[in-house]
């Protein structure tokens, strides 16, 4: 009986007196195959080599479509303006004018990017980037609009608070930090990041204190506006790969901001007074001061905003010029807040109902209870943001107790619960009702 070592070496000699060796994989002898490749301690025949090649070819062909898909240029999901506006309406209640303005601006922006691939080098018409400025009271949906747009178009998105930004060399975040966050949101895929959306919140907070030029440094106001100019318009900016400050020996990622859409938003408190005074001055006759006061209290006055008004508020002309699309949002009345509670796809009431559903319990809000939530939110004066804080305060105790309660199948929130004068109604498997947690 031959050993494994003897098998590997061979099994004797062939008719011509040559030593016969065996394939280490299939066991065929060299006299049965066309050729045999020798390794340090093994042999492989031509048949096994061909079989291996065929197996590898099949595996590579299965992987190849994915590899091709990865190598294809990234293209945002482009929808027409009507589709964008309708999709925004599923998440943002009201604000038709702002939704329409945003839909057109975003469509034109990404259509412009798409056209860059086939536009001729000698074409005299170059479509410039149109960044967007959203003006409206707090809690009216500015951030939600930007976030929903990014989700809809399937592009990277990041939110930056303008109040955290300072000029280079001062304590705080450089403007390059904005791009670092967008890179992180795109998993450091540079091509995706360069077609993303950046929402700069509280942009009104970087307005300088007056329209007059000051000799003192304003490191978080006009200085930040100046620093933002180049990335708003389009420039190649060196960004630290993991955020933070630059240092001389650090390797930077060059990000081209030419195709990044910037959406800036702010409440701009006091802007209505500036607009009211300007519009009143344009009128002829007595009572200009009285008319100015009337205009200031008009909720529609923000629609009359002009670039001169923005300059008087404290934004420098160069900065205003890089935000050519200005859209205003309306204050939310009680009807709008009521609809926000229940109508959007991700409405607050639906979110709480989903949480209760996980506990196999149905959550029901009576109509009067919802009306009470809206009244409290209006008194707080922070728009839709107040709705969540009101509901959290009411629901926290209920959600604390519910997982420990067995057999509960339904929970009803009444007006008395919202007012803090009653307990929710719990219905059990046997149909019995109990008004306590």
From Swiss-Prot:
Keywords: ATP-binding, Chaperone, Metal-binding, Nucleotide-binding, Zinc. Zn(2+) binds at residues 23, 26, 45, 48. Pfam families: AAA_2, ClpB_D2-small, zf-C4_ClpX. The keyword Lipid metabolism does not apply. Belongs to the ClpX chaperone family. Component of the ClpX-ClpP complex. Forms a hexameric ring that, in the presence of ATP, binds to fourteen ClpP subunits assembled into a disk-like structure with a central cavity, resembling the structure of eukaryotic proteasomes. NCBIfam families: clpX (TIGR00382), PRK05342.1 (NF003745). This is ATP-dependent Clp protease ATP-binding subunit ClpX. It comes from Chlorobium phaeobacteroides (strain BS1).
């Amino acid at each position: 009986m031959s050993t494994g070592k003897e098998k590997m070496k061979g099994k004797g000699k062939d008719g011509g007196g040559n030593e016969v060796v065996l394939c280490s994989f299939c066991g065929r002898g060299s006299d049965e195959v066309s050729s045999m490749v020798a390794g340090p301690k093994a042999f492989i025949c031509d048949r096994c080599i061909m079989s291996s090649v065929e197996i590898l070819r099949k595996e590579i062909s299965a992987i190849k479509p994915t590899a091709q898909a990865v190598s294809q240029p990234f293209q945002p999901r482009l929808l027409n303006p009507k589709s964008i506006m309708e999709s925004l309406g599923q998440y943002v209640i009201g604000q038709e004018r702002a939704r329409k303005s945003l839909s057109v601006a975003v469509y034109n922006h990404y259509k412009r990017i798409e056209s860059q691939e086939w536009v001729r080098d000698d074409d005299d018409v170059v479509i410039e980037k149109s960044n967007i400025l959203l003006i409206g009271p707090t809690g009216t949906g500015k951030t939600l609009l930007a976030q929903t747009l990014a989700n809809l178009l399937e592009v990277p998105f990041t939110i930056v608070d303008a109040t955290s930004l300072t000029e280079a060399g001062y304590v705080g975040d450089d403007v390059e930090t904005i791009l670092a966050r967008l890179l992180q949101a795109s998993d450091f895929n540079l091509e995706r990041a360069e077609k993303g959306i950046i929402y700069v919140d509280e942009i009104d907070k970087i307005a300088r204190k007056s329209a007059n030029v000051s000799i003192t440094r304003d490191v978080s106001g006009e200085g930040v506006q100046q620093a933002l100019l180049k990335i708003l318009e389009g420039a190649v900016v060196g960004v630290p790969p993991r955020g933070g400050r630059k240092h001389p020996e650090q390797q930077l990622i060059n990000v081209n901001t030419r195709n990044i859409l910037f959406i800036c938003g702010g409440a701009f408190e006091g802007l209505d007074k500036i607009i009211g005074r300007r519009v009143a001055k344009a009128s002829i006759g007595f009572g200009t001061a009285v008319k100015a006061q009337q205009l200031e209290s008009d909720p529609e006055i923000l629609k009359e905003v002009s670039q001169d008004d923005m300059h008087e508020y404290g934004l420098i002309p160069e900065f205003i010029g890089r935000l050519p699309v200005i859209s205003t949002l309306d204050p939310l009345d009680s009807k709008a807040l009521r609809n926000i509670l229940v109508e959007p796809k991700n409405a607050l009431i639906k979110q709480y109902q989903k949480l209760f559903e996980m506990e196999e319990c149905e959550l029901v809000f009576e109509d009067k209870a919802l009306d009470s939530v809206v009244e409290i939110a209006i008194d707080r004066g922070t728009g839709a943001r107040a709705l969540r804080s009101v509901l959290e305060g009411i629901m926290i105790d209920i959600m604390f107790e519910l997982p420990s309660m067995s057999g509960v199948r339904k929970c009803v929130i009444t007006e008395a619960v919202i007012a803090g004068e009653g307990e929710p109604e719990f219905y059990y498997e046997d149909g019995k009702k109990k008004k306590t947690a």
